[in-house]
Amino acid sequence: MTADKPRETKAQTPERVGERLLRIGVILAVAAVGFQTLAHLTNEFLLDDRVEGLDADVEGNAFTWAGSAAVFAVAIAALLHFVAFRERRREFLLVLGVATLFSLDDATQIHERIALKVGEDLLGLPDYAAVRLWLLFYLPLLLLMGALLWILAEHVWGPGGRALRLGLGLLVASIPVEIVGLVTRPLSEDGHEAPDDLRVAVEEGLELGGWVLAAAGLTAAVAVALMRFRQD
């Protein structure tokens, strides 16, 4: 009998671990967006919008939870970096605070309630216009978060920073798609539902994919930084 040869294993370098985390993040983003889009369009075009659990535009279902969890993952990654390192602590603390607020808001629909209260009750706007006032109310926070993520992407591990910026790009792209609802929602109320159904699928997909990629990029960057620190 011959002795078994020891298996050759690749060293778990920080970069290798970071790349693995990024691959997982990309796969998760594609799978989540694909499933959400397929479920939403199936419900709208084949099930006549009868299943609220499959509607990406309905608050309080599994898709809401997924979006809120993705935002909270960004907050957790920022917290880990804030606790472990002294570099860019102020920026990571701000990301932690804003991402936590966004996650809570996404789960409880605070922004929509405020927008509808002001838009409908005070300004007399139709609901499809009133609900989009949240973009104005939250504009300072949106700009702050975008600037923070862009800045941090320059100072973290390269591939993680690129994933972070890609996620940010998807989130920015979702805003004009949201605004298009000012046109497609009235069409939906007049019986032409397909344009708004497709718009919702695109908007929600961009948001979910953007937050998942941002979380994956920041998590991978923090993991690489922690492993490098341990090696030193």
Protein language model features and the residues they cover:
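Hydrophobic alpha-helical segments at protein termini of multi-pass membrane proteins
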Residues: 2-232
